[in-house]
Swiss-Prot record:
It comes from Micrurus mipartitus (Red-tailed coral snake). The keyword Disulfide bond applies. GO terms for biological process: venom-mediated perturbation of G protein-coupled receptor signaling in another organism; venom-mediated perturbation of transmission of nerve impulse in another organism. It comes from the Eukaryota. Expressed by the venom gland. Contains 4 disulfide bonds. This is Mipartoxin-1. Disulfide bonds join 24-42, 35-61, 65-73, 74-79.
Amino acid sequence: MKTLLLTLVVVTIVCLDLGNSLKCYVSREGKTQTCPEGEKLCEKYAVSYFHDGRWRYRYECTSACHRGPYNVCCSTDLCNK
């Protein structure tokens, strides 16, 4: 009975995913970060425009996303590539 109870507790913790575990890209090269508490969104947003027509982007965890036509705001792991 104790084994069953312990198993249920472990399964509950895993299913509830206690704590903040959202992972976001934080660089163009693919570096990732576990987001701090309170930042539950991943974002990729345009910060400048190069003369050849390419955008420079910033990648980060955030609590509120920037608005813009080329920006990505999402809430699942590694969704801001």
